[in-house]
Regions:
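Residue-level signal for cytosolic alpha-helical hairpin/rod architecture
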Residues: 6, 27, 81-82, 97
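Fe-S-dependent hydro-lyases/dehydratases of central metabolism
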Residues: 113-195
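Amphipathic alpha-helical scaffolding segments comprising HEAT/armadillo-like alpha-solenoid repeats
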Residues: 24-32, 53-72, 91-105, 122-134
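Short amphipathic alpha-helical segments enriched in leucine
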Residues: 31, 35, 47-51, 184
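Amphipathic alpha-helical packing elements
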Residues: 2-31
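Structural detector for internal amphipathic alpha-helices that build alpha-solenoid repeat scaffolds
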Residues: 17-20, 41-57, 71, 78-93, ...
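Active-site-flanking structural segment that lines cofactor/substrate pockets
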Residues: 34, 38-43, 192-195
Length: 195
């Protein structure tokens, strides 16, 4: 799996393109290696940095694997439960939210889950689950208060006073599809191919 990934990465680099993110099968292969005790720092870096966040199929596999680690259903030396929770917190929402809420409900690693969820705003219906937990779970209450205070926004770095931009002026009626391969692109990093 790794050999094929690195070959493809090199081929894309030669074309001036970033590597494609890992797909669901590749993420599952990495999870299987960790579960069988063959995990490595190299695989951890790929799992942390090369899986698309959100609701991609690969993100689903990653979130499920990390959830099992966080709930201590499986274990690996390189990814203790606290690290798994932190990694879920970097996935920007999507499948990671359900996993984090499941861990929050156990009342174990609550501080870690709270830290991860305080800065995750794409939680959709899971908001109600966390809201309902706040009377019996201090960390759920902490998350709700953090969202109410907009900590996810106010803790961001200040916007620069001056930003240099390139503006494209297109005459007539237009939309972003004129600058994007839209449904034809595998990912947003492929946009430079069009321009």
């Amino acid at each position: 799996m790794l050999e094929g990934y690195y070959k493809e990465k090199e081929k894309r680099r030669e074309q001036g393109l970033p590597a494609l993110p890992l797909n669901a099968e590749q993420v599952q292969a990495i999870a299987d290696l960790f579960e069988s005790g063959e995990g490595s720092d190299e695989l951890l870096i790929l799992l942390e940095n090369e899986v698309p966040p959100g609701v991609d199929e690969a993100a689903y596999v990653k979130a499920a694997f990390l959830k099992d680690l966080a709930l201590e259903k499986i274990s690996t030396d390189l990814i203790p439960p606290q690290k798994a929770i932190a990694m879920l917190g970097t996935m920007l929402g999507g499948y990671s939210v359900e996993a984090l809420v499941s861990v929050l409900k156990t009342n174990k690693f609550g501080a870690e889950v709270a830290l991860a969820l305080k800065h995750t705003i794409l939680v959709y219906d899971s908001f109600n689950d966390i809201f309902d937990l706040q009377d019996e779970n201090e960390y759920a209450k902490e998350i709700i208060n953090s969202w109410a205070n907009a900590d996810w926004f106010t803790n961001k770095p200040k916007v620069e006073t001056e930003i240099e931009l390139t503006i494209y002026k297109v005459g007539g009626e237009t939309n972003t599809d004129d600058f994007s391969p839209a449904k034809e692109a595998w990912s947003r990093p492929d946009i430079p191919c069009l321009l």
